């Protein structure tokens, strides 16, 4: 998804998207591990783009869902290589309510370093709630947001939507 359907937004910001094989939008821990091992085993890796984060979506654009076991395996690979796991939660409300998933919000917080809870696809006017698991918010995060022109004046009002969506389980 992020490699082709976001108009190059990641690369526009100066980062490089390195793809691994996908299967209906999902990646496998084994493929990820092979990709990372290949990178680190290459004697010239110091001259290459370093893998800096793993990005997954739940549900994917194909509607496929990760299982708890898959999420745990991918997280384990990320932690063994000391790179964060990011979960795109634009459709997270739908994924958590699916009868086909065994993934819960606490599991996502346990296995992912960063994720966001999408709002617009579940009834919010706009916005996503970014969650840094385990109190790992980057240093000076608010300043970084402002430097990139993404800090909205009175933006805290958008948070009220999420407070409401989490009341009486309206989010899912």
Regions found by a protein language model. Give the residues of each.
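Conserved PLP-anchoring active-site segment centered on the Schiff-base-forming lysine
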Residues: 1-4, 33
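PLP-dependent aminotransferase-class I/II
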Residues: 14-52, 56-59, 66-73
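Catalytic PLP-binding core of fold-type I/II PLP enzymes
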Residues: 66-98
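Alpha-helical scaffolding segments of alpha/beta enzyme cores, especially the outer helices
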Residues: 34, 69-80, 103, 107-110, ...
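Active-site-proximal loop->helix
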Residues: 5-15
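Active-site C-terminal subdomain of aminotransferase-like
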Residues: 50-58, 65, 103-171
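Active-site-proximal loop/turn and secondary-structure-junction residues that shape catalytic pockets
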Residues: 60, 91-93, 121
């Amino acid at each position: 998804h992020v490699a082709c359907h976001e108009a190059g937004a990641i690369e526009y910001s100066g980062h490089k998207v390195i793809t691994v094989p996908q299967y209906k939008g999902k990646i496998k821990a084994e493929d990820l591990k092979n990709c990372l091992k290949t990178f680190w085993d290459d004697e010239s890796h110091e001259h290459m783009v370093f893998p800096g984060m793993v990005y997954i979506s739940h549900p994917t654009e194909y509607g496929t869902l990760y299982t708890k076991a898959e999420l745990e395996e991918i997280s384990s690979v990320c932690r063994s290589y000391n790179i964060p796991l990011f979960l795109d939660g634009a459709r997270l409300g739908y994924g958590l309510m699916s009868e086909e998933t065994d993934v819960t919000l606490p599991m996502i917080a346990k296995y992912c370093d960063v994720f966001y809870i999408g709002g617009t696809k579940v009834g919010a006017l706009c916005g996503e709630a970014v969650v840094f698991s385990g109190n790992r918010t980057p240093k000076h995060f608010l300043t970084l947001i402002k430097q990139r022109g993404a800090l909205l004046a009175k933006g805290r009002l958008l948070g009220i939507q999420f407070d409401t969506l989490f009341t009486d389980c309206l989010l899912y």
